[in-house]
Amino acid sequence: MVKLVCAIVGVAGSAFPVDTDASQLVGDLKKAIKAENAMTFTGDAKDLQLFLAKQPVDDESGKEVVPVYRPSAEEMKEESFKWLPDEHRAALKLVEGESDDYIHALTAGEPILGSKTLTTWFYTKNNMELPSSEQIHVLVVVPDGAGGSASDTSRMDRLFDKVDKVYEHTVLSKRTRYVHSEMNSAKGNILLNDLKIRISPVDTVKFAGGVPTPAKEFKWKSDRTEEQQKEPYREYVVANIGDVLTNNKLCVVGVEKGVNILTVEVPGRDIVLAGRTDMIVLSDIAQKFPHYLPHLPGVRMLIEVKKVVTTASEFQALSELIALDIIATESVMALLTNLTNHWQFFWVSRKSDDRVIIETTTLIAPGEAFAVIRTLLDQSPSAGAEVSLPCFEKPVKRQKLSQLLPSISEASGSSGIRESIERYYDIASMLGPDLEMARAVASQVARSIPTLSYFS
C-alpha cells in the first residue's frame, strides 16, 4: 500500500491523500481520486488527466525545468528523480489554487496512461523515488465542463473568477516571492541588490580569558536525513547553552516543516520572503504554549542547520535573517552551522552610503561558538546596543532593517485599482463574495484600460 498526495490544478485547498496499491492500474487511481472529490466534478473518472509532480532541476541558465528520464542513458539510472516538495514555490501556489509556470510545464507533458500500473509509470518509465510524506505526487487536471454543481458555472462565479485573475495580474504578479529553502547565488544576489544590502565579512580573534568551555562536535548519522536528526541536534544545542536559557527564560524550538513562521512582506517593496528556519531561540512561553510560536515572542536568534554548508546555504540564512528582522521587534542574529566545524554568524550592522551592511564572521570550534551564543543571549536585544562577544574582532552593534532600508514609494498609475481589488478581497474574506462590489471593481478595471473604456 502506498499513500499518494494528489492536488487538483486550479482548485484551492484541493491537496488530499489517496491510499492505493502500486500494482494497481492508473485507471483505478482515477476512480479513487473521483471518489475523494465527488462534489468537485461529476464526469467520468477516465476523463481525468493525471501528471507526475516531479521536483524541478535547473538547466544551464539556472531556470527550473521538468526532468525527463531517458532509460537508454545509464548515468540517469544512478539516482532517482524526486517528487515535488510541499514547500516548493510551485506546490505552495498549487494548493492555493494559483497559477505557476512550473505547474503549467508539468501539465503540458505526457499524462499518465490509465492502462499502465503505477509501478510501471512511476519507476520503470520515470525512475521516481519512493513516495513519502511532505511531497506532492500527482497533479489532477479536471476537463472543462466537469464541474460538480450548477453554481460552478454561474454568472456570479464567472465574475468572481475574473476579479481573481485581475487581482493576480495587478497585485500578485508585481510581487517577487523568495522561498528561503530555494535560495541560491543568483536569487540571493538579486534579493540583496533589490534591498541595497551588502555583506561584509569581519575577522575573528583568539578566544580571550583562557579556554572556552569544551564542546564536542555533533555526530551526524549517515543513515538518517537531516530532518530525521532534527530533535537530536536541537537537544545537542540545548545541552551546550542550557544554563543561559534557564537564566533568561528562553528556549530552543525546532520548527516543523510546513510551519512557515518566516513568511513576511518586505515593507515598501513588492517582495515576499517565505518559509522557515530549523531552530529559533525565543521566550520559553513558546514552549509552554506552542500556539504562541507563530508570534515569535522574545525571539533572539535563528539557527539554520546544514550537514554540508554551501554558498546557497549562506544566501538561505541571509534571507531568513532579513525576514526575522522584519518580523521581530528587537534586533536579532542568524547562525548558519553544520554543528561541527562551521559556525557562521550574521547580523544587521550599519549603513554605509546608500547600502545596508550585514556583517558576518565564522568560527570553527564548537566551544567558541557556544561561548558566543551564551554571551549573546545574556545581553540586551535592544537595537543599537553594543555587545562584546568572544572571538569577535570588535564589539557588535546590531541595528534594525526598518531603520536602515531606504523607503520606496509605490507611485504607480494602477495603485487605485490595486487598492480597490485588495479592499474587495479584505471584505470578501470576512463577509463572503459580494456580487455588486465585484461588478464595481470590474467596472473600474475596465475603465482604466483604454481599449475597454469606450464600452464602460
UniProtKB/Swiss-Prot annotation:
A motif (HVLVXXP motif) lies at residues 137-143. Coiled coil: none annotated. Keywords: Glycoprotein, Host nucleus, Secreted, Signal, Virulence. Induction: Expressed during colonization of the host plant tomato by P.infestans. Residues 18-54 are annotated as: LQLFLAK domain. Residues 1-17 form the signal peptide. GO terms for biological process: symbiont-mediated killing of host cell. InterPro entries: Crinkler_N (IPR045379). One of its GO terms (cellular component) is host cell nucleus. The CRN proteins have modular architectures that include a signal peptide, a conserved N-terminus, and highly diverse C-terminal domains. The conserved CRN N-terminus harbors a distinct LXLFLAK motif, which is followed by the conserved DWL domain. A highly conserved HVLVXXP motif marks the end of the CRN N-terminal domains and forms a junction where diverse C-terminal domains are fused. The conserved CRN N-terminus mediates the translocation into the plant host cells. Belongs to the Crinkler effector family. Secreted effector that effector that induces cell death when expressed in host plants. Induces the expression of defense response genes in tomato. This is Crinkler effector protein 2. It comes from Phytophthora infestans. The gene is CRN2.
